[in-house]
Amino acid sequence: GRSLVFPEETANSFVELFPAKELSL
């Protein structure tokens, strides 16, 4: 997942915890 608005796979669930803008993903 790249953001809280776009949840994807559980493998990327750790990314959902933070805004995509801060991770620059």
Swiss-Prot record:
Any GO CC annotation of this UniProt entry: extracellular region
Q: Does the keyword Secreted apply?
A: yes
**Which one of the record's GO molecular function terms can you name?**
metal ion binding
Q: Where in the cell is it found?
A: Secreted
Q: What keywords does the record list, in alphabetical order?
A: Acute phase, Calcium, Metal-binding, Secreted
Q: Name one GO biological process term.
A: acute-phase response
UniProt cofactor note: Binds 2 calcium ions per subunit.
PTM summary: Glycosylated.
Question: Cofactors per UniProt?
Answer: Ca(2+)
- Tell me which domain of life the UniProt entry assigns to the organism this sequence originates from: Eukaryota
Principal subcellular localization: secreted
Pentraxin (PTX) domain spans which residues?
Answer: 1-25
Question: What is known about what this protein does?
Answer: Displays several functions associated with host defense: it promotes agglutination, bacterial capsular swelling, phagocytosis, and complement fixation through its calcium-dependent binding to phosphorylcholine.
- How is the quaternary structure described? Heteropentamer. Discoid arrangement of 5 non-covalently bound subunits 1, 2, 3 and 4.
Family label? Belongs to the pentraxin family.
Protein known as: C-reactive protein P2 subunit 4
Q: Which organism is it from?
A: Gadus morhua (Atlantic cod)
